[in-house]
């Protein structure tokens, strides 16, 4: 097995970018989801209620985050504060009281105008700390293999992702789904619908469901359980248009047998190796 795709999402819910190599630090991939859009109360905003977020592209330079959107032009945001930045208390799902740096009025106005809602961009700074939280055990969809989060430790930290710093999926799993879609007259969907960090090849479809630990290159990961999917998978990541697929088809065969409200595709991961580098082409080994 090999790593065939490596993706960064500099701002949560904005368009991601493929990279050939990426460094790893305590929070995950360097440059991945270090920025977040929040409302006036500090609650995170995502494509779920705001599919227009998919229309904003991201680019990282050595010193700045560049945001672009058709009709709105481009705006640049420093990766690090050049002076003490105002702090905002923000929340993401079960993570409350997170301290982040406000990125300023200019980008707030730019985003608010484009998205049509008052909002602010915040950045991970020195005071940010977000531990990976324990979750209940879930069965892998289509199997009864338990995936238990009983090894979460205090050093397991992460960024502004939903629940875990990494998401892995196999090319074979997407191919299996697309075969089903085509067989019922639907269009195949690209990998970007699932916003993975890591894409692997050389294993059967849904083999990742059963991985408890995996090594990619020199980096070892621990399973955080299957990823429950939402309406973001039905959102075209370039047009922002939303349909019914692939979630409707996934619901026919990828429901969690212990909780049918959860529809699984891809596997959450926590990195046990807290520094290093991942490269497309790295060997992948199930441990």
Give the label of every model feature segment.
Residues 1-287:
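Metal-cofactor-dependent catalytic cores
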């Amino acid at each position: 097995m090999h790593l065939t795709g490596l993706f960064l999402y500099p701002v949560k819910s904005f368009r991601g970018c493929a990279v050939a190599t990426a460094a790893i630090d305590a929070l995950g991939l360097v440059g991945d989801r270090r920025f977040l859009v929040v409302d006036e109360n500090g609650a995170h905003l995502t494509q779920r209620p705001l599919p227009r977020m998919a229309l904003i592209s991201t680019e990282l330079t050595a010193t700045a985050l560049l945001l672009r959107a058709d009709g709105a032009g481009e705006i640049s945001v420093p990766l690090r504060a050049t002076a003490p930045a105002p702090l905002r208390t923000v929340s993401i799902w079960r993570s409350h009281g997170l301290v982040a740096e406000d990125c300023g009025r200019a980008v707030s106005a730019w985003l608010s105008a484009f998205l049509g809602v008052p909002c602010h961009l915040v950045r991970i700074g020195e005071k940010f700390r977000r531990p990976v939280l324990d979750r209940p055990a879930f069965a892998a969809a289509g199997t009864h293999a338990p995936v238990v989060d009983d090894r979460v430790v205090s050093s397991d930290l992460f960024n502004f992702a939903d629940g875990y710093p990494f998401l892995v999926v196999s090319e074979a799993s997407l191919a299996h789904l697309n075969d089903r879609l085509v067989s019922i007259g639907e269009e195949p969907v690209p990998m970007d619908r699932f916003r993975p960090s890591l894409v692997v090849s050389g294993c059967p479809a849904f083999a990742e469901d059963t991985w408890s630990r995996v090594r990619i290159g020199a980096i070892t990961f621990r399973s955080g359980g299957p990823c429950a999917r939402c309406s973001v998978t039905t959102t075209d990541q370039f047009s922002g248009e939303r349909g019914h697929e692939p979630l409707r088809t996934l619901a026919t065969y990828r429901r969690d047998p212990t909780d049918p409200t959860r529809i699984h595709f891809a596997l959450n991961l926590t990195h046990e190796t807290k520094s290093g580098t991942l490269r497309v082409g790295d060997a992948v080994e199930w441990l």
